[in-house]
Curated annotation (Swiss-Prot):
Name of the protein: Guanine nucleotide-binding protein subunit alpha
Lipid-acceptor residues (N-myristoyl glycine): 2
Molecular function (Gene Ontology), one example: GTP binding
Similarity remark: Belongs to the G-alpha family. G(q) subfamily.
Segments of this protein annotated with the region G3 motif: 196-205
Keyword ATP-binding attached: no
G5 motif, as annotated region: 323-328
Taxonomic path: Eukaryota, Fungi, Dikarya, Ascomycota, Pezizomycotina
Species of provenance: Sporothrix schenckii (strain ATCC 58251 / de Perez 2211183)
Entry superkingdom: Eukaryota
Region spans: G1 motif: 35-48
Matching SMART domains: G_alpha
Segments of this protein annotated with the region G2 motif: 173-181
S-palmitoyl cysteine lipid modification positions: 3
Self-association and partners: G proteins are composed of 3 units; alpha, beta and gamma. The alpha chain contains the guanine nucleotide binding site.
Amino acid sequence: MGCGMSVEEKEGKARNEEIENQLKRDRMQQRNEIKMLLLGAGESGKSTILKQMKLIHEGGYSRDERESFKEIIYSNTVQSMRVILEAMESLELPLEDQRMEYHVQTIFMQPAQIEGEVLPPEVGNAIEALWKDRGVQECFKRSREYQLNDSARYYFDNIARIAAPDYMPDDQDVLRSRVKTTGITETTFIIGDLTYRMFDVGGQRSERKKWIHCFENVTTILFLVAISEYDQLLFEDETVNRMQEALTLFDSICNSRWFIKTSIILFLNKIDRFKEKLPISPMKNYFPDYEGGDDYAAACDYILNRFVNLNQHESKQIYTHFTCATDTTQIRFVMAAVNDIIIQENLRLCGLI
């Protein structure tokens, strides 16, 4: 009887070799593919980071893409002024100049979504005039008492340019534009030899149940916290402090069984607004155990420790950065550091170091 392999054995061996080769290819692809989940409470800056990645790694936005942001920026600007005017009524703050009432009516007549290539001149004029009113300014100073877009002041300060007939959004305008993220969006970037698949998920509570679909084989979590919101309440539940909500969410993510081996990068974001707020809104009013007064470094250390100390796994390292997501120069530097961290983590997971 011959000792050669049967047809079935040869076919079986060929199948095994093909499976082994496919597994090798999969491992190589997995080594070069980074699946990053962007997490954080609503309005923490996740979408802004994705825009920065496009600016830094994809050459920025085309003219057509910038055009598409016009209506978003117009709507953000008009709605922000509407929110202030409505807050003035509830806070019983009068206009300094009652002749501004005409401009108030102009704002209230606008639809929720502004459409068109150009902001109507009467709307631009109304915002410019109202922004100079002391009553409006006083209400703006109390914006922690209601829900106002972070970029309101930026757009109001730039209203003459935004309302110009030849207006074209620049990088900063695009970065500061705000559209609520619903569902899950995936964005792919190539950085060196690595392919990043970045998933942005809705931060509001109602969106969180959808995160489960992103959990499998996640390489890294980028968790964002808007530290400037230490004195604000949630949009969806105005009995809950935003920073407390972020701490609760970070605790659940950091110590989740899904993420025992997943590296976590923590961006303590919106440091520019945080630094502005500290002298006028004492952090001790919201966190009674804080003893650092309005010292910026002490406040940063306090918040950093509050988050890092939630980690219950000694083997898990939390990589932290203080960030301003609208500052492209800083984000370019920070993301380069993040890339180095991820490469090391990926090599470790693949057993290469």
